[in-house]
Amino acid sequence: MQSLKFVALDEEDLAIISTHLQDATVKVADVLWRPQEKRLVIGLDRFDWLSAEGDKPEFRRCRAALRFERVAACKCKQVNPAGKAAVLNLLAVEFEPTDTPGGVVKLLFSGGGVLRLEVECLEAELADLGPTWTVDMRPAHVADVLDARG
């Protein structure tokens, strides 16, 4: 598997990043909000959906970082920032434009958790940080996406 590195400057770019982040696991301790820098950085373990397809599927994960710049506010719904050991399952990342070029980025987690970012403009980056490792199973829980969107 080749390392991924994507930059998102619009909704279409973010949709590509969201696809690669479906079913990534995130420890609450790995969510870093820097209000003075207007930056949110998330360390996560993303599932490699491309390796899970084909005649000989392999289930792998890779450590990655997701970074958002120009973040004016970050709010949590059903995510306890004090619960540092909790592990969240990322289902999707969405962008809703408000005052162009600004808008709201939503990171939707299974169980209804949401991180809501108010951004001056969409500026995000996803980058793999190291080698992959194998895992035993492919993630499966489609109904949670509807719950998270509420």
For the regions a language model picked out, list residue spans one by one.
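Short linear functional motifs in flexible/disordered or boundary regions
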Residues: A29, G54, G83-K84, L129
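Intrinsic, low-complexity N-terminal interaction/targeting segments
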Residues: A15-D23, V41, K77-L107, L115-R116, ...
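Eukaryotic intrinsically disordered, low-complexity regulatory linkers and tails enriched in Ser/Thr/Pro
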Residues: M1-Q22, V145-G150
